[in-house]
């Protein structure tokens, strides 16, 4: 079919308008499916890389955290990825808890290809592992803090620098308040940094499975001081706050081997990590959606131009006054 020059001149503005109003991602999006994920990304190659990495993280991190791989979900989790070199890294994972089951997974991730693959994706996958294992919302510090420990060292170092700044400026969160948080506070960035630091402190002293057992016992009893004493030999949240602050002030040193050896012997830990409910529509009760609204906080964190030089740690008086927020 041949077009006259007049027809081409008439069509050209229409094509320009379509290109302007359609999102670039919709023109380039490609898909890839694995056993547990359906990925939409700018290119087929990138979708494949994200999908394969998601499955690998799901397998390996579940073993590290709960002792065995997760069963296959009855329905795959859609992952929508926006990837560009200058795009701030971030992610959000949504799912529904209902009568002890979890389903309706949805995940969005964004950032540079490097940060998506080495930080955002493992962070969000860890959220799904915890949701599958605990089947209920966790305190925000315990969830976000643990998920941040699997990110790239560059991102973890950034969180530490931000923590020091928050402690200096009085934006720290008292531990009794932080342990009670089931929702994100208005000032969310200190929660991420402080939660990561405390999770790191505990994991370095007992490993990831002890951390999971501690969180599980705290959820079951709603007595975090008792759970803390059972797993870490510290029987008070105020005491934990004090020893953690001292650790931060001394540069977060790795614990000697004797520390782990002296921890209380754990009770039998169940590695059970159930999968997704095979038929969520069978429930007779309306599901309660639980969204892990990580996007706002993480985008703000990673979009910041963090200084690459390590700041000095706070002195005792600054840190002590900064952490307590009444």
Map each language-model feature to its residues.
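N-terminal secretory signal peptides that target proteins for export/translocation
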Residues: 1-8
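Bacterial N-terminal signal peptides
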Residues: 10-23
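A generic structural signal for well-ordered alpha-helical segments enriched in polar/charged residues
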Residues: 22, 59-63, 246
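Acidic/His/Gly-enriched intrinsically disordered linker/tail segments
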Residues: 94-104, 115-116, 133-281
């Amino acid at each position: 079919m041949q077009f006259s020059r007049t027809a081409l001149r008439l069509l050209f503005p229409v094509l320009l308008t379509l290109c302007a109003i359609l999102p670039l991602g919709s023109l380039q999006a490609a898909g890839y499916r694995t056993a547990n994920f359906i990925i939409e990304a700018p290119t087929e190659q990138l979708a494949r890389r994200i999908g394969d990495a998601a499955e690998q993280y799901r397998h390996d991190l579940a073993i590290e955290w709960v002792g065995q791989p997760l069963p296959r979900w009855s329905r795959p989790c859609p992952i929508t990825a926006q990837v560009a070199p200058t795009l701030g890294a971030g992610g959000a994972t949504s799912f529904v808890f209902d009568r002890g089951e979890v389903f309706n997974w949805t995940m969005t991730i964004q950032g540079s290809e490097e940060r998506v693959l080495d930080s955002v994706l493992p962070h969000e996958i860890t959220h799904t592992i915890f949701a599958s294992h605990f089947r209920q919302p966790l305190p925000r510090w315990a969830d976000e803090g643990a998920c941040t420990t699997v990110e790239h060292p560059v991102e973890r170092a950034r969180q530490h620098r931000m923590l020091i700044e928050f402690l200096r400026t009085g934006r720290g969160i008292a531990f009794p308040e932080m342990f009670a948080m089931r929702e994100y506070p208005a000032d969310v960035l200190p929660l991420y940094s402080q939660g990561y630091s405390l999770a790191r402190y505990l994991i370095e002293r007992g490993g990831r499975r002890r951390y999971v057992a501690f969180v599980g016992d705290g959820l079951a009893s709603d007595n975090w001081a008792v759970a803390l004493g059972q797993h870490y030999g510290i029987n008070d949240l105020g005491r934990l706050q004090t020893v953690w602050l001292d650790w931060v002030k001394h540069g977060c040193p790795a614990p000697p081997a004797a520390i782990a050896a002296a921890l209380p012997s754990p009770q039998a830990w169940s590695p059970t990590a159930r999968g997704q409910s095979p038929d969520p529509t069978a429930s007779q009760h309306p599901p309660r959606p639980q969204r892990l609204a990580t996007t706002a906080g993480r985008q703000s964190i990673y979009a910041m131009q963090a200084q690459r030089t390590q700041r000095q740690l706070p002195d005792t008086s600054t840190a002590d006054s900064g952490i307590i927020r009444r």
